[in-house]
Amino acid sequence: MVCLQLLIIRHGDPDYIKDSLTKKGKREALLLCKRIEKLNPDFIYSSPLGRAKKTAKLATKTLGREITVLPWLREFEGRVGSGLFKDICWDRLPEDWTRFDGLYTDEWYDCAMMKGTNVREEYQKVARGLDELLSKHGYQHSGRIFKVTEPNHDTIALFCHFGVECVILSHLLSVSPMPFWHNFAALTTSVTTVVTEERRKGIAAFRILSFGDISHLYANNEEPSFACRFCECFDDDTRHD
């Protein structure tokens, strides 16, 4: 690999009550293990939440490398709404959020839907954490580009969650997280690959090579989880809200 490579990996099928993995989630993580072994990340970071840590442990068990826990990789804690009706940012109904043009811009957090919420504050926590991590690995965020202070070919694995993955991608690309949250789905144990491109010396940008790849599940006839998705047709007997 001739660039810095980020592997953003969602946890396995979750048992949210126990903050762990279901039996299916453990199977998914073990199938992911073979793939991670080939990718051979130099550095492994994990969310502090149990379902992500368990996935990281199972998926990297053959590597024998330290797993470093980063608090900002936990699931995104920003909430929209008010009073008793505050809820996660990525379950908004299409008719409720798409009417706000501002949510499609890089000033999305100034939109009326976000006013009076903790979303911008929580977003900035993730952004600061990500920038600090990338700086340690030789890439300093500067506006919408990255200054290369120490070019390298490191592969970094981030075991985390769907909501925060969208925030990470949003910050790397300087775009709103709202389309990522609502129009993309990173299924359980999916791998998103992001790499640097340094076309001019000392100046880099990030490019997504693949999003939500679950080929390790298909290769082993493991049915993908429905977690984070909604019904395809209204009359389907799958999740509506």
Region roles according to the model:
Residues 2-74:
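Active-site-proximal alpha-helix that buttresses catalytic centers in soluble enzyme cores
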Residues 38, 61, 139, 199-200:
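Secondary-structure boundary motif
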Residues 2, 76-89, 144-155, 167-241:
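Acidic, low-complexity terminal tails and accessory targeting/binding regions
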Residues 131-150:
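Alpha/beta-hydrolase fold catalytic core
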Residues 42-48, 146, 155-158:
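Short glycine-rich phosphate-binding loop at a beta-alpha junction
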Residues 30, 50-54, 124, 128, ...:
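A structural signal for well-ordered alpha-helical segments within the folded catalytic domains
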Residues 64-137:
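Phosphate-handling substructures
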Residues 12, 162, 212-214:
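Active-site metal-binding loops of divalent metal-dependent hydrolases
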